[in-house]
Swiss-Prot record:
The modification Pyruvic acid (Ser) is found at residue 29. Pfam families: Asp_decarbox (PF02261). This is Aspartate 1-decarboxylase. The gene is panD. Catalyzes the pyruvoyl-dependent decarboxylation of aspartate to produce beta-alanine. It comes from Rhodopirellula baltica (strain DSM 10527 / NCIMB 13988 / SH1). Belongs to the PanD family. HAMAP family: PanD. Keywords: Autocatalytic cleavage, Cytoplasm, Decarboxylase, Lyase, Pantothenate biosynthesis, Pyruvate, Schiff base, Zymogen.
């Protein structure tokens, strides 16, 4: 029997959700509105990587389905020490993809607004380019600067 090689690939991402609550006394997990889970094709209890854009922290937990139409993204249990209301987070789920399919694999990428409402579905834009505020189909160059006045996009 020949083992099929696999690669761990991004399967789904919810980009820049706004955290609405944090409860250290809850047993654990990350509450996500069911509408976002369905849009991203993430299942309840699926493993999630949580990257806190605001604080720079990262953790792994699992998704728990919130109430319909609630827009609540809540850090529960120990995660509440690393994530606070108002933080922006990226939620990512991974899958093992057969090597033969890796080159054509396309993850499900969804982007949300500050109220955790779906704004659009993929594709992802590679840095140093950014989406235009007026039109998701147009790109602009990043104008962020380092403390010494150099463009942040250098070296991307």
């Amino acid at each position: 029997m020949v083992d099929t090689p696999y690669r761990k690939m991004l399967a789904a991402k919810i980009h820049r959700a706004t955290v609405t609550g944090a409860d250290v006394n809850y047993e654990g997990s990350l509450t996500v509105p069911p509408e976002l889970l369905v849009a991203a094709k993430i299942h309840p209890y699926e493993s999630l990587h949580v990257w806190n854009v605001t604080r720079g922290t990262r953790l792994e937990t699992y998704a728990i389905e919130g109430l319909p139409n609630s827009n609540d993204v809540c850090a529960n249990g120990a995660a509440a020490h690393l994530i606070r209301p108002g933080d922006h987070v990226i939620l990512a789920a991974y899958a093992m993809v057969p090597e033969a399919d890796a080159a054509t694999h396309k993850p499900r990428l969804i982007f949300v607004d500050d109220n955790n409402q779906l704004s659009h579905v993929g594709p992802e834009i590679a840095g140093p380019n950014l989406r235009s505020d007026s039109d998701d189909t147009h790109l602009v160059r990043s104008t962020e600067m380092t403390p010494d006045g150099q463009p942040l996009a250098e070296g991307c």
